[in-house]
Structure formats: structure tokens, C-alpha cells
């Protein structure tokens, strides 16, 4: 079945939120954020071409300090392939997607709001993941000693069947 208007609106909202973060990063002064926050803001982005169905999202991996992920992220480099795996048995969110390395190492989860927008489309066969890769990574070893977790962003390219 086709994507519903509600599903499409939900998707467009999430794409717009990611893109707004990127635009904000370009337009606000450096003193607007705590040091270090600006570059992360700029790492988010999103676009959806309704004519072609091409979806591109740059989003932050969540939960990087749990499940031994901090250690796995030390081994990850920009451009590394990411496997986006549907995780419907997740006790916290049945819409979850896990982010794994090519070797199957767990490097986090897609943000919940994105999962909630994408999972119904994915489950109905209306979203096909084309490629996913690490677009930005800062392992905890490279961050300030006050940092509690690694930072990792993923570039996801997908096709939406209208």
C-alpha cells in the first residue's frame, strides 16, 4: 500500500527539523552555544525530493554510552559503512532501528522521532535503504575529559515509494 498523507507529513517534519538544525548552525553566532555544540548542530541535515522519492538524512546516533558502544566507536572512521537494522523487539521503542558496523558491531540507535517516522514506511515496503555511512565521528578519547559519550552521525540515503 502507498504512503499515507499522515506518514508523509511525519517524514517531511523530521527532514525539516534536521535541515533547520543545519541552517541554524550557519546563521547563529558562536557564542550562542556551549563550546563544541556548534559543530555538532551543523552535522544534522535532511532533504526529501518528492519527485524522485530520494531521502537523505544526516542524524546523530543515540545511546552511544550504553551497550559497550563507546568502545566500538573508537574503531569507526568517517565513511565507514553502517548497517541500518530494524529492531522491532526493542523494549523501549518497537519502531527502533539499530546502527551496526559492517562487522555487526553496535554503534547506537537512530533517534526515536526518526524511527517513528520511518519504521511504518519501512515495514510496509515503502522505504528502501540505499546506503548508510558514518558522516562524522568523535570518539570519547578525542573529546574533553568532561564528555560522557562519543559523538557519531550517520548519512542515510533511501528511496521512498510514493
Specify the residue positions occupied by each region the protein language model found.
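Conserved active-site motif detector
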Residues: 1-162
Amino acid at each position: 500500500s502507498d504512503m499515507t498523507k499522515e506518514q508523509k507529513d511525519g517524514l517531511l517534519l523530521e527532514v525539516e527539523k534536521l535541515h533547520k538544525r543545519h541552517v541554524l548552525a550557519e546563521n547563529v553566532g558562536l557564542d550562542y552555544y556551549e563550546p563544541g555544540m556548534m559543530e555538532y548542530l551543523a552535522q544534522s541535515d535532511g532533504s526529501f525530493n518528492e519527485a524522485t522519492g530520494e531521502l537523505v538524512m544526516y542524524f546523530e546516533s543515540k545511546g552511544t554510552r550504553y551497550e559497550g558502544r563507546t568502545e566500538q566507536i573508537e574503531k569507526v572512521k568517517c565513511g565507514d559503512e553502517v548497517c541500518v537494522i530494524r529492531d522491532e523487539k526493542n523494549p523501549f521503542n518497537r519502531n527502533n532501528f539499530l546502527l551496526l558496523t559492517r562487522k555487526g558491531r553496535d554503534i547506537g540507535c537512530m533517534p526515536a522521532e526518526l524511527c517513528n517516522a520511518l519504521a511504518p514506511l519501512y515495514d510496509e515496503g515503502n522505504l528502501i535503504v540505499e546506503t548508510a555511512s558514518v558522516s562524522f565521528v568523535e570518539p570519547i578519547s578525542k573529546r574533553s575529559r568532561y564528555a560522557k559519550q562519543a559523538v557519531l552521525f550517520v548519512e542515510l540515503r533511501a528511496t521512498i515509494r510514493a
